């Protein structure tokens, strides 16, 4: 039926989930203990709101549920959430037959089973050119900021929404020293709870703090089981993840921060004077870490839209292939439709192809790179042969220095009091209880190390040299020095091995990721309950970290250009990004096979905040463009109309997904030739002339018409051009990459081009 469960194709294209790393459902989180042991949590999505009165909307949700259950009391007990601000819908405990029945209601677009998923700085801003940092931090000092920071007052009127695991409010990064009044448009609030006092813990920096647990608890009989859920029944952060991401996006200045002396410097967020609103939807569960219920996440989105945040930073991910029953991206669509940029993580499932998640065209999807900083550990063998190895933050050797005997684990020797060498290819054995001091583990470059600082990780080449030394020495020894901090060359940035890669497996013509930002060994504040925290700070790695980097930059752009749409800001980032490092070195992609990074690794490139502030031209998108995407993806008129809250018809003929006005061109199946269009908006000098510069992919001829864009007046800031791609390949090919740049001599507006040839048989 048209109004019940959507077609399988539509559901698949809607499948965007809301939390990082794993999609494993937790066996202990069931509906057992509920009034009906067969009941589960479902989200009933009704589309755009029909009116602005939230009380009337909630009443209508109860009426619909009462009609289904034939009991006002049962409807009240079944209802978990009413979504009434950004969109219309509710979450409720239903049996599968009840879910099927309500899905057939003419006002229901989709019924979505609730899911439980697992949660996936000093140097950053200097590295990206967003500096200098003030030398004084008193309220009376005038911060010596320049460029984007200066022109936006460091984001003082902006509001960053962070959907995560909450906040540790006592952290110095949330001090409100020198901040003016809270923006008048703010409609949110702080909610008190366990060890969180709204009056005491919120201030002019942390202006919002809410928490959502009903969806999670409903899957466990409605109980907050302290044995299983080791968390606070409030916005207070038990895992440290939310505190870390909020710091990166908008933390205040904190000088002399470090992790055991590493990465020492001033910690601050991208928009250090922006206000932070924390929406806790993720909870610390024993054995699983941070987990989140999609019903809770929807409510966080709903409230954030109502509260009028400027950006939503959600360090999230999804399973690959994406689950056809997860349509949580709908909440993000409604946020974007209200002008809120939603910044999402590319995921940590790299470095293989087609591992990218968060692929909807309205999301700003972020990959992770290293910084021009490393933390090398010095390994000195007894023959004075020396090696330097660098690890991710989670497995740094912070000392003190050790000097021990050295042995290979596979040898029949006593390892007590020694450092041992292992290879991951030989299935490392358990060393518990054997008296081993440290382990040098030689591993594949694509493997992400476990967070254990008793391990020193290296590659096979160095491991083989160490093994040869052991084999040829009667009493081998080793000295391992604590990691040190190295910045600048030769520590040039690379796309991290764990960062998920394109191409997009759901909509191949939509390039993902959009952009890359630093996400490896990022220093930020954490909860003191975070294992290994040092004076309230810790180094973490992941696209969880690169996402708030971009969120902080977005609020600066929003402050500078308040009328820009989320799509315009994404375009500004993509078209001005670095395709080499800030120092001019090539950007490589880490993984099993090291290579030069391409658009499937980093989208447009490494984010360049200062350039993004003045992009010259932008590839803008609005609701009409998203409608064309939905039409090209197979959505029917009825479904689109309900999502938008107004009658909508797809154009005839159906739009091509190649014509979606993205700041990129991706042609997944070029047979002979194809022509597509793009539209640019002049946001630079009113009178401008841009000329096309084409770098065609191998074996592909690109032709642009016209080759010159002339902007003559403020009334004519929008121009359209066409691009014809023609292949000379005679057999099927992989993807080849190029670019299209519009230049006026000052601005270089570059979009990546990715083309794969497919020959019909």
Curated annotation (Swiss-Prot):
It is an enzyme of class 3 (hydrolase). The keyword Protein transport does not apply. Residues 134-613 form the Peptidase S8 domain. PROSITE patterns: SUBTILASE, SUBTILASE_SER. Residues 22-120 form a propeptide. It comes from the Eukaryota. Glycans are attached at residues 151, 197, 256, 384, 636. The keyword Transferase does not apply. Its main location: secreted. GO terms for cellular component: cytosol; extracellular space. GO terms for biological process: proteolysis. Residues 1-21 form the signal peptide. One of its GO terms (molecular function) is serine-type endopeptidase activity. It is found in: Secreted. Keywords: Autocatalytic cleavage, Glycoprotein, Hydrolase, Protease, Secreted, Serine protease, Signal, Zymogen. Residues 41-119 form the Inhibitor I9 domain. Its EC number is 3.4.21.-. InterPro entries: Peptidase_S8/S53_dom, Peptidase_S8/S53_dom_sf, Peptidase_S8_Ser-AS, Peptidase_S8_subtilisin-rel, Peptidases_S8_3, S8pro/Inhibitor_I9, S8pro/Inhibitor_I9_sf, SBT. The active site is at residues 164, 241, 544. Belongs to the peptidase S8 family. This is Subtilisin-like protease SBT3.15. It comes from Arabidopsis thaliana.
């Amino acid at each position: 039926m048209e109004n019940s469960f959507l077609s399988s194709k539509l559901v698949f294209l809607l499948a965007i989930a809301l939390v990082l790393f794993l999609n494993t459902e937790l066996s202990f989180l069931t509906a057992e203990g509920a009034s009906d042991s067969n009941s589960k949590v479902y989200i009933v999505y009704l589309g755009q709101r029909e009116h602005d009165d939230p009380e009337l909307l909630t009443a209508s949700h109860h009426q619909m549920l009462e009609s289904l259950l034939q009991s006002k009391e049962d409807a009240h007990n079944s209802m978990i959430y009413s979504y009434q601000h950004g969109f219309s819908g509710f979450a409720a405990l239903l049996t599968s037959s009840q879910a099927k029945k309500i899905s057939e209601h003419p006002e229901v677009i989709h019924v979505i089973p609730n899911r439980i998923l697992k949660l996936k700085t000093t140097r950053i801003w200097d590295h990206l050119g967003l500096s200098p940092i003030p030398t004084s931090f008193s309220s009376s000092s005038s911060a010596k900021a320049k460029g984007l920071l200066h022109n936006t007052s460091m984001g003082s009127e902006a509001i960053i929404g962070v959907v995560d695991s909450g906040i540790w409010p006592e952290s110095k990064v949330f001090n409100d020293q020198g901040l003016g009044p809270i923006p008048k448009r703010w409609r949110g609030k702080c909610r008190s709870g366990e060890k969180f006092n709204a009056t005491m813990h919120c201030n002019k920096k942390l202006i919002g703090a809410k928490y959502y647990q009903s969806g999670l608890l409903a899957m466990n009989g409605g109980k907050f089981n302290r044995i299983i859920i080791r968390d606070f029944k409030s916005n207070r952060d038990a895992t440290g993840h939310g505190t870390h991401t909020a710091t990166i996006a908008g933390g205040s200045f904190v000088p002399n921060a470090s992790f055991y002396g590493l990465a020492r410097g001033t910690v601050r967020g991208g928009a250090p004077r922006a206000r932070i609103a924390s929406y806790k939807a993720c909870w610390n569960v024993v054995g699983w870490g941070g987990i989140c219920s999609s019903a809770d996440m929807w409510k966080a989105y709903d409230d954030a839209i109502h509260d009028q945040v400027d950006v939503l930073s959600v360090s999230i991910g999804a399973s690959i292939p994406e689950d056809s029953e997860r349509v949580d991206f709908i909440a993000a669509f409604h946020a974007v439709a209200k002008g809120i940029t939603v910044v999402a993580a590319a995921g940590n499932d790299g470095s293989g192809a087609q591992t990218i998640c968060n692929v909807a065209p309205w999301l700003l999807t972020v990959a992770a790179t290293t910084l021009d900083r490393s933390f090398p550990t010095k390994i000195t063998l007894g023959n004075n042969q020396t090696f330097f190895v660098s690890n991710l933050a989670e497995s740094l050797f912070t000392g003190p220095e050790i000097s021990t005997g050295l042995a290979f684990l596979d040898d029949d020797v006593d390892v007590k009091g020694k450092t041992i060498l292992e290879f991951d290819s030989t299935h490392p054995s358990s060393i518990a209880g054997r008296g081993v001091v440290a382990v040098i583990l030689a591993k594949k470059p694509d493997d992400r190390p476990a967070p254990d600082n008793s391990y020193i990780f290296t590659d096979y080449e160095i491991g083989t040299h160490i093994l040869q030394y052991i084999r040829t020495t009667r009493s081998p020894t080793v000295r391992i020095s604590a990691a040190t901090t190295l910045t600048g060359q030769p520590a040039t940035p690379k796309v991290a091995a764990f960062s998920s890669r394109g191409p997009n497996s759901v909509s191949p013509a939509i390039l993902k990721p959009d952009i890359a930002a630093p996400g490896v060994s990022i220093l930020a504040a954490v909860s003191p309950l975070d294992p290994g925290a040092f004076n309230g700070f810790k180094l973490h790695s992941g696209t969880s970290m690169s996402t708030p980097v971009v969120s902080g930059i977005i609020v600066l752009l929003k402050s500078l250009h308040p009328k820009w749409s989320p799509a315009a800001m994404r375009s500004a980032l993509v078209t001005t990004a670095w395709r080499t490092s800030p120092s001019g070195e090539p950007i490589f992609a880490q993984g099993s096979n090291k290579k030069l990074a391409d658009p499937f690794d980093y989208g447009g490139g490494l984010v360049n905040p200062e350039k993004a502030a003045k992009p010259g031209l932008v590839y803008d998108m609005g609701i009409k463009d998203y409608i064309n995407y939905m039409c090209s993806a197979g959505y029917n008129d009825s479904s689109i109309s309900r999502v938008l809250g107004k009658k909508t018809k797809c154009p005839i003929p159906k739009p091509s997904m190649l014509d979606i006005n993205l700041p990129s061109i991706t042609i997944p199946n070029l047979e002979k030739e194809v022509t597509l269009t793009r539209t640019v908006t002049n946001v630079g000098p009113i009178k401008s002339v841009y000329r096309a510069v084409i770098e065609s992919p191998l074996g592909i001829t690109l032709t642009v018409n016209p080759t010159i864009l002339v902007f003559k007046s403020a009334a004519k800031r929008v121009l359209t051009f066409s691009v014809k791609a023609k292949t000379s390949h005679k057999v099927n090919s992989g993807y080849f990459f190029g670019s299209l740049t519009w230049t006026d001599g000052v601005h270089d507006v570059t979009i990546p081009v990715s083309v794969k040839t497919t020959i019909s048989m």
